[in-house]
């Protein structure tokens, strides 16, 4: 970078596992930067990713630069991430929502130091593996970082904006599978869309839910141990997670469940699924039975998919009862939910 930039250095340079860090901005606007929060978010991310991936931050320094007229929101150059100056929100009231959004972008670019730079996709077919992971992991990092507790109450609400982007894109005639065939680099630009970011990260969130935190983390350790400083494909990634899943002995998805096949259902086909609660009430008007009916959207490959969800039951006074896990099968698309007896349920939420 060249130009009239000023910078601040990390005031906590001796914190274990943290490389030298600087934040740069044009000297004329440098006072607009919230240095304390940026350094805090970055350090929390480095600690969490080290634990999650089994590898410390892999480069010698980490600089972050606010650039005028940046073509993109941000770019994950090795050891020198660049951000559009619009993230400074100059002259605006800086709300918690805006701070959370930028913290997510900060952690997104930091995640690329592992997913993208330490391990790189072999070809554009697997662009989603870079972008989907870097979209989901910031929110898991916030939940597991006590020093970022101020973001935790609403961080998943912010994540849902990416999911809605994916849902809307997946209902267009131009939709495509998350992992799709790309024949040239010219075609690759079209993949930077709601499918690669939104639907892909939503799939990974369900994958994280299926495996559980510790098994998911163990699979990522296998992945980075084997493929660091190399190029990978979808089977490499799924194989590492499947190794951890098999070792866990978990049978919550059923004895016939095969993780690679399930991943292909989601990654290699397009289109949404719709889950609808079907309610039956007794003579007193109380909920007696609940079935979940799965149907297909109008666009895409039109297929049912196995899903692991939670169901929240609400009583009149707002008391919540969570039934989890609930497995929605991919054969007839229905699932029966066991309702606790003696409850006067007034609302049902499928998650």
Where are these regions (language model features)?
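Hydrophobic alpha-helical and helix-loop surface patches within well-folded domains
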Residues: 8-293, 298-300
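Structured beta-strand-rich cores of soluble
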Residues: 1-16, 326, 341
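Beta-strand-rich binding/interaction modules
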Residues: 255-260, 270-350
């Amino acid at each position: 970078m060249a130009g009239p930039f000023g910078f601040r250095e990390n005031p906590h340079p001796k914190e274990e596992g943290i490389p030298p860090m600087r934040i740069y901005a044009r000297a004329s606007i440098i006072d607009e930067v919230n240095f304390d929060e940026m350094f805090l978010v970055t350090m929390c991310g480095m600690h969490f990713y080290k634990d999650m991936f089994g590898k410390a931050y892999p480069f010698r320094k980490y600089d972050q630069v606010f650039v005028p007229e940046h073509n993109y929101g941000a770019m994950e150059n090795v050891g020198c991430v660049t951000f559009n100056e619009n993230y400074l929100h100059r002259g605006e009231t800086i709300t918690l929502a805006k701070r959370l959004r930028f913290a997510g972008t900060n952690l997104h670019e930091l995640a690329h130091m592992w997913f993208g730079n330490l391990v790189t996709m072999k070809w554009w077919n697997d662009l989603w593996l870079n972008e989907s992971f870097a979209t989901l992991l910031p929110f898991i990092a916030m939940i597991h970082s006590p020093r970022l507790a101020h973001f935790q109450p609403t961080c998943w609400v912010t994540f849902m904006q990416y999911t809605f982007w994916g849902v809307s894109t997946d209902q267009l005639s131009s939709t495509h599978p998350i992992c799709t065939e790309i024949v040239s680099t010219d075609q690759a630009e079209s993949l930077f869309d709601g499918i690669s970011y939104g639907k892909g990260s939503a799939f990974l969130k369900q994958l994280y839910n299926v495996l559980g935190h510790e098994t998911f983390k163990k699979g990522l350790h296998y992945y980075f141990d084997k493929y660091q400083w190399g190029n990978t494909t979808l089977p490499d990634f799924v194989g590492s997670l499947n190794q951890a899943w098999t070792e866990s002995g978990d049978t919550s998805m059923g004895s016939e469940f095969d993780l690679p096949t399930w991943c292909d259902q989601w990654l290699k086909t397009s289109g949404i699924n719709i889950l609808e609660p079907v309610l039956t009430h007794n003579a007193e008007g109380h909920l007696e039975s609940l079935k979940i009916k799965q149907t297909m959207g109008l666009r895409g490959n039109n297929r049912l998919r196995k899903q692991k969800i939670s169901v929240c039951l609400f009583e009149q006074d707002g008391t919540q009862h969570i039934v989890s896990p609930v497995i929605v099968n991919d054969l007839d698309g229905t699932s029966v939910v066991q309702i606790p007896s003696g409850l006067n349920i007034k609302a049902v939420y499928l998650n």
